[in-house]
């Protein structure tokens, strides 16, 4: 077996040490050590990178490959210490030469961080003797073709609350024959003796045997030359290609990350990194090798190539580290990426359901039972088991599928959103009447008892402008509440409804004349009927123009979204000019004061059972004879699966004398679903899938632009049918890298970004197929299309004639297809002549201009992402390559000539640009900007070793080999072959030095793919303006994408880990499968675009967002103390930096929690008032957090007259397992017995009151009388957290709801019911108060504490996983 030595280097930066809540003052330091899998022979070397700052009296050092940070002293609370220690860990690995990439990706790297402390200066003399107090182990998910670039704040345990911020950069830096010896583990013998490590000298393996395989036998020099067999030659070629490809992929990933950093942070000091296109460089290296036949020359050439690539990689790695090391901007950028990924991951297995407020009083036994069953199903489901890890994760603080809690949230609001209209334009309506909804049209067949599906906004910029959770409103009700919108209802598959939203267009004044820039005038006088009033609002019966119901189809990307088709609609009496028109600029709902027209932008998603032919007939039968032109409709899911869902984009524009609008969009099919939506993140398209540009809105500034779009669509349809290639919607071919969200997948992914990027790429690996019948029927439904094209005769007369033949081919082909379609569609199903056929002549006559048709090549996308003039839109790579390969090298270097090629390649001719039959055999990727691509094409320049660079390369290689030699010399002093190795190395280096400029070799079988030189979607620079209300930090796009942990499958280079892709896809598939099988009317937080936390812990700049103080009072429970809620306080402070929070950790009752509630209430209110007066606080809001018994004390405080002044400042009440209804119906005999004994022993008044034994008359008991007093309704949010695993506090008591036993109890049950009504009826009556209940299923070990219910009772206090998940996903929003 041939073996290869690979070297991976990790650069680890310790930035800051944050004292969150350490108990002891003294001296601390952190130790870092790296571990690799013991099953892979390896050698580890740890070094410190140059220290520039004064390290103090106790500098950092390295001892036995463990790096000790400098010693620092902690004296104050919330103290931050700058560490800024940088260390490098080089890992030399002995790998299987036949599967180098797989072997490298299978190495389990673990970074161990230990916190050591001493308060004795005597121990500082020997740092190794300082005791360990806490430790964390981080898993590093490294892949050689993408590297690892991540930042993570590591929090130590509960008793040592502190954080060390760590940045890790990792990259493959070398592959070559083994040069050092490795210790190999030996299995223990059968006698039971411990295994001993056996050192084997691998350097004895000759280079020839590595290259040609074990079958090769080098003859003695006396026997002459030996010709190796064909198998040996092929082995050499493959061995060379695999290693070179891996090194080139690592080089490309490193260069790409470096370029992305500079794009995001252009002010960084940096060195230019030479680009090496992976495919072309690899092809040239392989072709050069294949020209050689002598085995010695082959071996020498392979050694040269590997040495050259190693040198390039080492230089790039050093330049990269110089650029990013200890740079605050880079740290902040990576910090945001990690936080977004982590929050998104926590949002999995977090459900929410909305109910009407009166339902809070009902007995929801079925809901509780379904949540319990679902929790068990999730624990055993593939969905949770397939949850991918973060790029760098710590199981203790990040959790895994086996430890993450499952949470169900029940919201009780004025208008529950089980079916949504989520339009960001309506996020903050001017008044509640602006949210209007239509009744179902009598013309539609509705299914009784069925539920409409969701309606979601898809305007270009809306998904990026989440100022707060969008307004969602239940269909057929006029109401609005705040909260996340997207969701899924799995009962919807069995039921469907056909609700109808019909547009009403009020006739507008006709201007005297409206002419376009080209002189074309468009008259829409054919329609003369007004629309019937169908759309109404319950509260205000006024017209809702612009909202038209159209049946739509589900997206191939996300089954809960819809493919979009835009209808250009106009009304009689309105003269609309398409030239010189603009789309409405406002993203919000606007009212035109002149004509009363209102603009709506949304997609109506409904489950329907009709076909698209029914859709057309429905449109024809509408009384509103508006001119609706469906330019192109999607038939994707009908061709892939039998679906009953359709989608359509509906657009109604305000039209007056001065404003003219033209909108175009279409829903073209994506044969290969490159994106599997996860967690609500707008997923990015694959690098080889057609970007969903047609699902976005585009502005057409002239008639010719509209015709161009028609031509492009028709061309796409023709080619797709000609090729007849279809790919599975659930599986992706090799090389496709879908994205999930991370971070882009992250909540801030904007839909406009997807549209902008689609202008840079066009892949034919996912051919587009549209139904010709539907498209033409829709086109011929209207005269407008004919008039538009007819007007082109005038406007095209000014165009250049050199492209006339190309454009004429378009028109001829389209005309022929239309004629053939008309032949089939002349008669309808009942034999009568189709009324649309009469439009054929108008359409055909207007379709073909005279001879001036130079509109095609002049069309240019206005791409905000690419500001440079030499960037270009959708181009087939094959066309570019063919054009460029036909030119000489000098022309290739000429950028002006290149742009001419691009212009021609961008033109849309009638002939296919590529052979469609070869589509599936060709790999495509994102097209980089033109300048970058053409600079890459001079292959000879890209891979040559210029004389100026030889010296620096020699130096880097000499240093590398000298280091290897030093390592070997230290380990094995008796080694005798070290000198010979250095001689061999020197000979190799001398060969590199004398290497002349590489001559050009004919590129044979050059792949079209140039993925490595192209920018991935995930790293595209974002130039769109920041939208008000949307966090700028949230708008950041991650620098890199990690294969195993970023909740997305990236496209950084052509060799991205397929195993990682499969893992991501398997997770999405498991999630989709789980959704389909789910019998629960709820929604996942992971499907929401915006979650509660968008700012990472310890941001570089904390902006005070509030004027006054937000006082948070934390009250412990029975037999507790003020430190019980430390973690709650910690995660609130970390999650809301700049929120101006002031915490009062109540301690007045910690000495006696067995007193009665009145006494404890007096102490707490005294403590609150004294705290405010002592610190002279200017209170703007007050929130309470109580655990167990503390929740009752808080409610009692609210009833006291002394607190009356603060009632109007109450904000949130967070109840953690609070026995609001006492312990009357506790189902734990053990707990009841324990409480009885404790009450007897302690003479506890509070326990007596909790058990309703403080008075013989239940209605005179403390808890009953407390329920009659006002309190909860003064809060904005009442959040009740409970767990059925908690046996200390009854589940129903913590949630303030009925229980089954109470309904059967005729004596105590009515009193129990009255208590619930007393508590909740004021909450229902208060419009400003929202009640939220949480049902938490903890992942608890099988211990005695779990058995008696104590573990779940205290888990809400000391479980980092629960608290972080709860606050980051939803809880922080209640304190904002």
UniProtKB/Swiss-Prot annotation:
GO terms for biological process: lipid metabolic process. InterPro entries: AB_hydrolase_fold (IPR029058), DUF3657 (IPR022122), DUF676_lipase-like (IPR007751), Lipase-like (IPR044294). Pfam families: DUF3657 (PF12394), DUF676 (PF05057). Residues 431-489 are annotated as: Disordered. It comes from the Eukaryota. Residues 431-442 have a biased composition (Acidic residues). Residues 443-462 have a biased composition (Polar residues). Belongs to the FAM135 family. PANTHER family: LIPASE ROG1-RELATED-RELATED, PROTEIN FAM135B. This is Protein FAM135B. It comes from Xenopus laevis. The lineage of its organism: Eukaryota, Metazoa, Chordata, Craniata, Vertebrata.
């Amino acid at each position: 077996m041939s073996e290869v030595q690979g070297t991976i280097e990790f650069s680890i930066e310790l930035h800051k040490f944050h004292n969150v809540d350490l108990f002891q003052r003294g001296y601390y330091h952190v130790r870092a050590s790296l571990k690799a899998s013991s099953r892979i022979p390896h050698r580890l070397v740890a070094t410190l990178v140059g220290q520039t700052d004064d390290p103090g009296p106790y500098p950092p050092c390295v001892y036995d490959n463990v790096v000790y940070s400098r010693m620092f002293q902690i004296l104050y609370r919330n103290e931050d210490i700058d560490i800024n220690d940088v260390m490098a860990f080089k890992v030399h690995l002995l790998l299987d030469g036949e599967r180098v990439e797989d072997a490298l990706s299978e190495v389990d790297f673990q970074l161990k961080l230990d916190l050591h402390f001493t308060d004795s200066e005597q121990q500082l003399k020997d740092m190794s003797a300082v005791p360990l107090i806490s430790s964390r182990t981080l898993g590093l998910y490294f892949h050689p073709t993408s590297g690892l670039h991540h930042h993570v704040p590591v929090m130590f345990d509960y008793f040592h609350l502190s954080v060390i911020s760590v940045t890790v950069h990792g990259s493959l830096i070398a592959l070559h024959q083994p040069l050092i010896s490795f210790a190999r583990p030996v299995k223990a013998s059968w006698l039971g003796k411990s295994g001993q490590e056996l050192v084997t000298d691998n350097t004895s393996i000759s280079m020839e045997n590595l290259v040609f395989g074990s079958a090769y036998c080098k003859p003695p020099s006396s026997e002459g030359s030996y010709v190796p067999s064909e198998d040996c030659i092929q082995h050499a070629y493959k061995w060379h290609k695999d290693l070179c490809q891996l090194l080139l992929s690592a080089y490309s990933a490193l260069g790409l990350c470096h370029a992305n950093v500079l794009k995001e942070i252009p002010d960084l000091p940096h060195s230019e990194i030479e680009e090496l296109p992976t495919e072309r460089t690899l092809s040239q290296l392989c072709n050069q090798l294949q020209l050689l036949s002598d085995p010695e020359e082959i071996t020498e050439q392979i050694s040269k190539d590997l040495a050259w690539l190693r040198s390039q990689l080492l230089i790039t790695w050093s330049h990269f580290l110089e650029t990013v090391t200890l740079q605050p901007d880079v740290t902040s950028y990576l910090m945001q990426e990690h936080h977004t990924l982590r929050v998104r991951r926590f949002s999995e297995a977090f459900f929410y359901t909305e109910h009407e407020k009166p339902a809070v009083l009902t007995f929801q036994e079925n809901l509780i039972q379904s949540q319990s069953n679902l929790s068990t199903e999730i624990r055993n489901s593939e969905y949770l088991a397939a949850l991918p890890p973060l790029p760098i994760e710590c199981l203790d603080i990040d959790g895994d599928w086996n430890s993450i809690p499952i949470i169900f949230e029940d919201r009780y609001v004025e208008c529950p959103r089980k079916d949504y209209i989520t339009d960001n334009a309506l996020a903050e309506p001017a008044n509640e009447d602006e949210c209007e909804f239509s009744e179902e049209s009598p013309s539609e067949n509705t299914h009784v008892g069925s539920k409409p599906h969701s309606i979601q906004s898809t305007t270009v910029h809306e998904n990026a402008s989440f100022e707060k959770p969008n307004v969602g409103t239940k269909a057929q009700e006029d109401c609005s509440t705040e909260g996340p919108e997207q969701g899924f209802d799995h009962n919807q598959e069995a039921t469907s409804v056909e609700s109808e939203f019909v547009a009403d267009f009020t006739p507008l004044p006709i201007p005297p004349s409206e002419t376009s820039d080209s002189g074309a005038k468009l008259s829409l006088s054919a329609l003369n009927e007004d629309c019937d009033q169908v759309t109404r609002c319950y509260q205000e019966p006024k017209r809702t123009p612009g909202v038209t119901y159209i049946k739509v189809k589900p997206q191939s990307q996300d089954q809960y979204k819809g493919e979009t088709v835009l209808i250009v609609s106009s009304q009689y009496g309105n003269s609309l000019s398409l030239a010189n028109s603009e789309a409405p600029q406002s993203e919000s709902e606007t009212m035109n004061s002149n004509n009363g027209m209102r603009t709506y932008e949304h997609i109506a998603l409904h489950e329907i059972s009709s076909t698209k032919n029914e859709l057309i007939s429905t449109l024809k039968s509408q009384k509103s004879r508006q001119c609706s032109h469906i330019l192109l409709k999607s038939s994707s899911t009908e061709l892939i699966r039998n679906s009953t869902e359709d989608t359509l984009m509906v657009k109604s524009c305000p039209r007056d004398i001065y404003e003219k609008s033209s909108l175009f969009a279409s829903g073209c099919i994506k044969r290969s679903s490159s994106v599997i939506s996860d967690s609500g993140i707008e997923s990015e398209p694959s690098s080889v899938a057609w970007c969903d540009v047609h699902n976005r809105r585009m502005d057409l500034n002239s008639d010719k632009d509209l015709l161009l779009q028609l031509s492009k669509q028709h061309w796409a349809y023709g080619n797709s049918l000609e090729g007849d290639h279809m790919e599975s919607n659930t599986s992706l071919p090799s090389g496709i890298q879908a994205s999930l969200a991370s971070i882009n997948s992250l909540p801030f992914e904007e839909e406009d970004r997807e549209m902008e990027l689609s202008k840079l790429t066009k892949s034919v690996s996912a051919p587009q197929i549209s139904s010709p019948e539907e498209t033409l029927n829709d086109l011929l439904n209207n005269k407008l299309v004919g008039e538009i094209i007819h007007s082109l005769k005038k406007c095209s007369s000014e165009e250049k004639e050199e492209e006339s033949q190309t454009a004429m081919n378009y028109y001829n082909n389209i005309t022929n297809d239309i004629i053939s379609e008309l032949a089939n569609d002349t008669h309808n199903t009942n034999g009568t002549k189709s009324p649309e056929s009469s439009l054929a002549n108008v359409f055909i006559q207007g379709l073909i201009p005279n001879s001036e048709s130079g509109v095609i090549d002049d069309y240019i996308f206005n791409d905000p992402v690419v500001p440079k003039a030499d960037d270009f839109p959708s181009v087939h790579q094959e066309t570019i390559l063919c054009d460029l390969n036909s030119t000489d090298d000098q022309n290739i270097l000429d950028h002006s000539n290149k742009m001419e090629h691009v212009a021609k390649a961008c033109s849309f001719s009638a002939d296919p640009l590529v052979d469609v039959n070869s589509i599936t055999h060709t790999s495509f990727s994102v097209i980089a900007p033109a300048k970058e691509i053409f600079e890459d094409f001079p292959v000879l320049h890209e891979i040559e070793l210029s004389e100026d660079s030889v010296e620096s390369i020699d130096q880097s290689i000499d240093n590398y080999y000298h280091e290897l030699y030093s390592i070997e010399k230290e380990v094995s002093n008796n080694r005798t072959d070290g000198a010979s190795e250095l001689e061999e190395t020197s000979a190799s280096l001398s060969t590199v030095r004398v290497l002349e400029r590489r001559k050009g070799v004919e590129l044979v079988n050059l792949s079209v793919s140039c993925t490595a030189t192209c920018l991935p979607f995930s790293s595209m620079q974002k130039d769109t303006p920041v939208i008000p209300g949307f966090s700028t930090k949230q708008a950041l796009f991650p620098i890199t994408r990690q294969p195993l942990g970023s909740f997305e499958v990236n496209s950084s280079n052509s060799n991205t880990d397929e195993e990682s892709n499969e893992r991501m896809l398997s997770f999405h598939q498991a999630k989709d499968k789980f959704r389909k099988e789910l019998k629960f009317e709820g929604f996942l937080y992971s499907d929401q675009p915006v979650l509660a936390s968008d700012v990472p812990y310890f941001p570089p700049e904390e902006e005070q967002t509030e004027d006054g103080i937000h006082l948070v009072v934390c009250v412990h429970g029975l037999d507790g103390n003020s430190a019980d809620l430390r973690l709650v306080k910690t995660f609130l402070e970390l999650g809301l930096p700049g929120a101006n929070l002031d915490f009062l950790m109540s301690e007045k009752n910690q000495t006696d929690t067995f007193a009665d509630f009145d006494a404890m209430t007096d102490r707490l209110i005294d403590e609150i008032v004294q705290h405010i007066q002592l610190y002279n606080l200017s209170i703007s809001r007050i929130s309470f957090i109580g655990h167990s018994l503390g929740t009752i004390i808080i409610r009692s405080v609210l009833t006291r007259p002394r607190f009356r002044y603060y009632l109007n400042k109450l904000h949130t009440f967070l109840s953690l397992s609070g026995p609001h209804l006492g312990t009357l119906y506790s189902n734990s005999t053990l707990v009841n017995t324990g409480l009885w004994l404790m009450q007897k022993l302690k003479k506890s008044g509070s326990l007596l009151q909790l058990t309703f034994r403080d008075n013989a008359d239940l209605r005179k008991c403390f808890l009953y009388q407390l329920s009659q007093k006002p309190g909860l309704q003064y809060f904005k949010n009442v959040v009740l957290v409970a767990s059925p695993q908690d046996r200390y506090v009854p589940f129903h008591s913590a949630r303030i709801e009925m229980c089954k036993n109470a309904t059967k109890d005729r004596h105590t049950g009515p009193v129990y019911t009255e208590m619930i009504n007393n508590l909740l009826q004021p909450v229902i009556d208060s419009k400003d108060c929202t009640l939220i209940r949480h049902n938490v299923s903890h992942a608890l070990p099988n211990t005695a504490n779990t058995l008696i219910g104590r573990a779940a009772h205290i888990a809400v206090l000391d479980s980092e996983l629960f608290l972080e998940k709860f606050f980051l996903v939803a809880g922080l929003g209640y304190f904002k």
